[in-house]
Amino acid sequence: MKTLTCDDYDPNSLTVEVALQRIDRDLQPIVGEEQVAIRSALDRILAENIFSPVNVPPHNKSAMDGYAVLGTDLPTEGKVQLAIVGTSWAGKPYTNPITTGQCARIFTGAVMPIGTDTVIMQEQVERQGEMITLSAGHRIGQHVCLIGEDLQTDQLVLVTGKKLLPADIGLLASLGIPEVKVKRRLRVAFFSTGDELCSLGEVLQPGQIYDSNRYTLYALLNRLGVDMIDMGVVRDNPQAVETALLSAALTSDVIVTSGGVSVGDADYVTETLRRLGEINFWKIAMKPGKPLTFGKIKAVSFFGLPGNPVSAMVTFYQFVQPALQRMMGQNKSTPLQIKVPCVSPLKKRPGRIEFQRGILEPDEQGRLVVRTTGKQGSALLSSMSQANCFIILPIDCGEVTVETEVLVEPFASLI
C-alpha cells in the first residue's frame, strides 16, 4: 500500500475506535426476561446458563450398521466365526447378554448389548445364515459412541448471553429441555426525515425520491430480532421532529433515525435534540458515514445516521448493531476479518478509515481474493447490493495497487 500525506485529515474527527468506546460507555443491557418454548427461541438471547440434565448419549450406542461383538473375540490374525444371537434396533435394544463366540446384529443409534464393546461394519464381515466370519485388523471400541461422550450430566452447555442458533435449538431438544429463559426483545423505534422523501405506494412529485433508508433499517433491525416501531417519514419542521422523538421515547428502548436529524445541519433540529436530551454531533474519521449523532432522548438511547443510503448502512453495521447487541444482552463477538489479495486497484487518501464495498470470491486458481464493486459513492446503494464484504482500508493507507493484501470483513460475519 502506498502511504501519502494526510491531506484528508480532520483534527476534530473521532476515530472509529474512540466513538465505539464512548458509545459502549453509555449503554446498559435492558432489564426483563421471559420463558419461551424452544420452537420460539431461535435468535433470542439466552438469559440463563443451561446445564445438561442427562448424559448424551444416555447409553453406549452403535455409530454404524453392523455387528456388536466382544473386543476379546477380535482375531489378531486369521479369521474367527461368531454366532448371531439377536438384533439390537434403534429404540428397541437387545436385552440379553452377549458372551464369547456370540454377536448381535445392530443398527446405527441402537444400544450396545450387554457385554459388547465393538462394532464391525456390515460390509466387513462374511455372513452365512446365523454365523459371521470376520478377519483381523479391527480395533477394540471402534464405531461405538460411549455414554456421556458428547455431554455429561451437569456439564455447562450454553451460557447466558448466547444468541440461540438452529444447532442450539436442536441441542436443547436433545437434552429434553422444552423451554428456556430469554432476554425480552429490545424495542427500537426508527424513522426517516426529509420533505423530499416519498413512501412506497405514493406517486413521486418533482424533486422527491423514494424512502429507501427506512426499508433498509427495517431489514437490518429485523435480522437482529428486535421489536420494531416504524414511525414512517417525519417532515422537516420543528414540531414534527419533536413530536416524533417524544413519541418514540415513550415506547422504545432505542431510537434510530436517518437524514437531517443525524447531522444537525438545521438549527431547529439541533436545538430540538439538545432540548430533549443529551446529544453529541460527531464527525467520524471514516468514509462513508462521517456524520453520526449519539446520545439520549429522555432515558432512551438515540442514534442519528447519515441520509446517504450507503453511509447509513455502514454506520449501522459499525456502530448501531454492536450497540443494540450489547443492549440486548448478547455476548460480545468480533466480526470475522481476513487478509486477502485485492485484484483491482483502489483509490484512497490517508486521513480516515474507509469501508469500500467488495466482492470476496475464489479466483481461477482457487485463491480467495477480493475486488471492488466499482464506484464507491455514498449514495450508490447498488454497490452494497452487489457486495458481499467491506474492504477496510486503515487511516494511514493511500492508494492500493493490484495484488496488495487488504483486510476484508464478510457481510455474513456481521449478521
Describe the role of every protein-language-model region.
Residues 1-17, 178-305, 309-315:
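Helix-rich terminal scaffold detector
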Residues 1-77, 330-355:
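Short, low-complexity N-terminal leaders and the immediately following helix N-cap/first helix
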Residues 2-14, 67-230, 235, 369, ...:
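Short, glycine/charged-enriched hinge/interface segments at domain edges or termini
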Residues 12-20, 34, 38, 60, ...:
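Generic structural signal for well-ordered, non-membrane alpha-helical segments
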Residues 20, 34-39, 48, 91, ...:
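Flexible glycine/proline-rich
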Residues 24-31, 49, 112, 155, ...:
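Structural signal for hydrophobic packing residues in well-ordered secondary-structure cores
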